[in-house]
Amino acid sequence: MSELVLGPLLRYVGEREATIWVETDCACEVEILAARTPTFEVDGHHYALVRVEGLEPGTSTPYEVHVDGECHWPPAHSPHPRSVIRTSRRGSPYRVIFGSCRVARPHEPPYNLARDQDPRAKEVDALYTYALRMTTRPPEEWPDLLLWLGDQVYADDVSNGTERFIASRRSTDVPPGPGVANFEEYTRLYLDSWSDPLIRWILSTVSSAMIFDDHDIMDDWNTSEAWVAKIRREPWWHERIVGGFMSYWVYQHLGNLSPRELDDDPVYRRIAAGEDAGPMVRELAERSDRDVGAMRWSFHRDLGPARLVVMDSRAGRVLDEQRRRMVDENEWDYIESHSRGDFDHLLLATSVPFLLAPGMHHLEQWNERVCAGAWGGLAARVAEWIRQAIDLEHWAAFDRSFRELAELERSVASGEHGGPPATVITLSGDVHHAYVYEVAFRRDGRASENGKERAAVYQAVCSPMRNALSSTERRVMMFGQSKPFTAAARAMARAAGARDPEIRWRSVDGHGPWFNNQLATLELDGRSAQMRIERPTPGDAGPPQLEQLAERRLA
């Protein structure tokens, strides 16, 4: 009898349609709400993306998953509420939770202890704790979207089960050691990361959107041209990167697409017609590694009163030192064109933050200039070592793209492409702490081009879901935000020929940063926007609880 291995994951949800992703143990037919889809096969693994259509806007519809006619979801005697599809309605209120960086570990000691208590500790899982609270609250208080902003899995810090699986297949005494080596090992990592019953339930009933960052492939992936040249000399790298792209396409990317976009996707269209998926997905992965323009991973969604544009800020980097870009020109055209329109809020999501603490921004500016030869060849080699050692690879380290994104936000916020939205908010993860910056533009005030008040502009960062920093790492981070460090870094950047940015930013109300496992919630209702950040705390002889760290009205 066919079995459900992983899922269901509720992925795309619009006003009248939804997609639901599953993995099964063999070729079969999957049925959800009378929609039937045959599985496709990739290297011995079987998947289906079921398209459910004909739903009504603004409704909640319970569903079951049938595999070859047998009900496999919900599990028998499940203690959790029923899985539902909650469709959106244009202009209606919308609740987004977002975060990044979640390692898969058991929810018990020593893994849920404080980082400084045990070297194996990852503290309490924020997503697990959020899901636990959801089960006790009415559906109208549930989020509409879970936005994953990178490092959904850690290919170089694998789960206990994945490490045992790898050790049963090959020696971990030689590279890549206990890290993932190929597609087969990635499938086990995703299984361990998403199969906890409570995590499985929240993923079945809250729509999700995802974009990868470095740890989905490897720490520091695509940091620089020199990093790529060095890693490609490793004999194990080809299968690692191909397996990473293959698994990302199957487990994450497909569900980001709307039904219409699936119809336009040449690979998925051939798979849906019955062609063998494995060779096609592998060929796509190999092209994606060698050609940044081979695949557009960025995507967009309309969320109630908002437009969400999720930008790939990892795979599509142009790394030539003389023409570095965070995304290539074609992908940037897509981002620009989908950031314009008639909506109350523009949400621009990027795994790595657009705005860092000012001192770190100046340091990355300095580093990019010196790596490109501003101080000569020897200094360039030293700067490259520094870049890789302390991860100087955010938008500030791609100055051309930084200025393009700043100009895009300014033009949208000031109403140059129509009426200005109420907010323009950049959502990010990656840096293992949380903060909210408010942004001001040097060239204009609060008035927009058409006389209306300009949109409020913010950078909101929330990280990690589960991979908190140690106390020593936190002190280093705080030093990078100090006034002496900022002054020194700015002087270095200017000495290397970098220009000050055209925007200014500061912490909202002077609060933050917060160093915890945490999740952020963004609530949109018409032209109002409210944000809060919560962290999980161990329960007193009971389950973990969420504690509010900050709440702020953004518009």
Walk through the language-model features, giving the residues of each.
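Metal-dependent phosphoester/phosphodiester hydrolase catalytic core
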Residues: M1-A555
